[in-house]
């Protein structure tokens, strides 16, 4: 007589216990868990039971559904965002989560499409809906003026998106930058002149001619020439351009922790300098750096008489 094998069915697990265990796992791994992690932790639970529990948690707004290079991720939902996304479907929640993860640098719709694997028409519909709810906003990037990046509505865009103080409506404020250049250099020149007039020994004169970036920043703020609030980082950017022009030199010294203008126990000091050798006229003229110099000749398609760079240089 043949032996009869009887398949023993595991006892049905309580759905609430499964959901609670998944929530516990999500708290253990705040960056998200995969289905494989859930399966490893609960090997006796069948795939269908896991799917039912996960879908229920998603529908109740307790989990966020994310996509990564390794596949789908389940992450515990932020309690603050749970109320905002009430009534939204899973696709809308997914797009919102992708935008949230992008932070204040934002994300293009093309990248949202890649991460969500949703059709572009569906993404555009979701984006308009989220914008109408004031959950997200579209911001034009200075890196690509015809493209918009999306970020959460309450975020201040990163400097890499707006261009910082040097841009207004995606236009580079060259005149404003030039004025700041002149004023920063003037301040350092006056500092150096005061040091020379002190008639002290050369070493003391040299040390007295230096100014910290905080001093320069304070001077510019007191002048009131900027309509936007400038940071020390903005002023250091201007000072760096003066260094590249050979008008200023920088040194870094050790500073006591907490000293105004110091960062991580170091302080940047700047002073105005005179060029050792005056630059030649060829370096100043656009011809010295022109990439089509070899093709330029009178009567040709490229010639000095119709050169826009030469015209601008002569007018300047």
Curated annotation (Swiss-Prot):
Keyword ATP-binding found: no
Entries under InterPro entries matching the protein: RNA_pol_Rpc34, RNA_pol_Rpc34-like, WH-like_DNA-bd_sf, WH_DNA-bd_sf
Family note: Belongs to the eukaryotic RPC34/RPC39 RNA polymerase subunit family.
GO molecular function terms listed in the Swiss-Prot or TrEMBL record: double-stranded DNA binding; iron-sulfur cluster binding; metal ion binding
One GO term (biological process): transcription by RNA polymerase III
Subunit details: Component of the RNA polymerase III complex consisting of 17 subunits: a ten-subunit horseshoe-shaped catalytic core composed of POLR3A/RPC1, POLR3B/RPC2, POLR1C/RPAC1, POLR1D/RPAC2, POLR3K/RPC10, POLR2E/RPABC1, POLR2F/RPABC2, POLR2H/RPABC3, POLR2K/RPABC4 and POLR2L/RPABC5; a mobile stalk composed of two subunits POLR3H/RPC8 and CRCP/RPC9, protruding from the core and functioning primarily in transcription initiation; and additional subunits homologous to general transcription factors of the RNA polymerase II machinery, POLR3C/RPC3-POLR3F/RPC6-POLR3G/RPC7 heterotrimer required for transcription initiation and POLR3D/RPC4-POLR3E/RPC5 heterodimer involved in both transcription initiation and termination.
Pfam families recorded: RNA_pol_Rpc34
Gene3D superfamilies hit by this protein: Winged helix-like DNA-binding domain superfamily/Winged helix DNA-binding domain (1.10.10.10)
Entry text on domains: The [4FE-4S] cluster-binding domain adopts a globular structure that serves as an interaction hub that connects the POLR3C/RPC3-POLR3F/RPC6-POLR3G/RPC7 heterotrimer to the Pol III core.
Protein name, UniProt field: DNA-directed RNA polymerase III subunit RPC6
Name of the gene this protein is made from: POLR3F
UniProt function note: DNA-dependent RNA polymerase catalyzes the transcription of DNA into RNA using the four ribonucleoside triphosphates as substrates. Specific peripheric component of RNA polymerase III (Pol III) which synthesizes small non-coding RNAs including 5S rRNA, snRNAs, tRNAs and miRNAs from at least 500 distinct genomic loci. Part of POLR3C/RPC3-POLR3F/RPC6-POLR3G/RPC7 heterotrimer that coordinates the dynamics of Pol III stalk and clamp modules during the transition from apo to elongation state.
Residues that coordinate or bind [4Fe-4S] cluster: 287, 290, 296, 307
């Amino acid at each position: 007589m043949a032996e009869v094998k009887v398949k023993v069915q595991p006892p049905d697990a309580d759905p609430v216990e499964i959901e609670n265990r998944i929530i516990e796992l999500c708290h253990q791994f705040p960056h998200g868990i995969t289905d494989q992690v859930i399966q490893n932790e609960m090997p006796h639970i069948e795939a269908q039971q896991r799917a039912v529990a996960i879908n229920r948690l998603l529908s109740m707004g307790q989990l966020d559904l994310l996509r990564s290079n390794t596949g789908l991720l389940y992450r515990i939902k932020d309690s603050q965002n749970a109320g905002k996304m009430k009534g939204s479907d899973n696709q809308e929640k997914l797009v919102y989560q992708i935008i949230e993860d992008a932070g204040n640098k934002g994300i293009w719709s093309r990248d949202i499409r890649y991460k969500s694997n949703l059709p572009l028409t569906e993404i555009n519909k979701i984006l308009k809906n989220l914008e109408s709810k004031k959950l997200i906003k579209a911001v034009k990037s200075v890196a690509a003026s015809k493209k918009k990046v999306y970020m959460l509505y309450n975020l201040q865009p990163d400097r890499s998106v707006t261009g910082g103080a040097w841009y207004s409506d995606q236009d580079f404020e060259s005149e404003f930058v030039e004025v700041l250049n002149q004023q920063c250099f003037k301040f350092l020149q006056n500092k150096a002149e005061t040091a020379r007039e002190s008639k002290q020994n050369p070493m003391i004169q040299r040390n007295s001619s230096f100014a910290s970036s905080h001093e320069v920043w304070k001077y510019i703020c007191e002048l009131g020439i900027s309509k936007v609030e400038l940071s020390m980082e903005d002023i250091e950017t201007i000072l760096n351009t003066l260094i590249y022009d050979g008008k200023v030199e920088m040194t870094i010294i050790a500073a006591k922790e907490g000293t105004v203008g110091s960062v991580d126990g170091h302080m940047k000091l700047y002073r105005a300098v005179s060029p050792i050798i005056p630059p030649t006229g060829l370096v100043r003229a656009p011809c010295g750096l022109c990439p089509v110099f070899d093709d330029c000749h009178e009567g040709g398609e490229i010639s000095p008489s119709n050169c826009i760079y030469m015209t601008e240089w002569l007018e300047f």
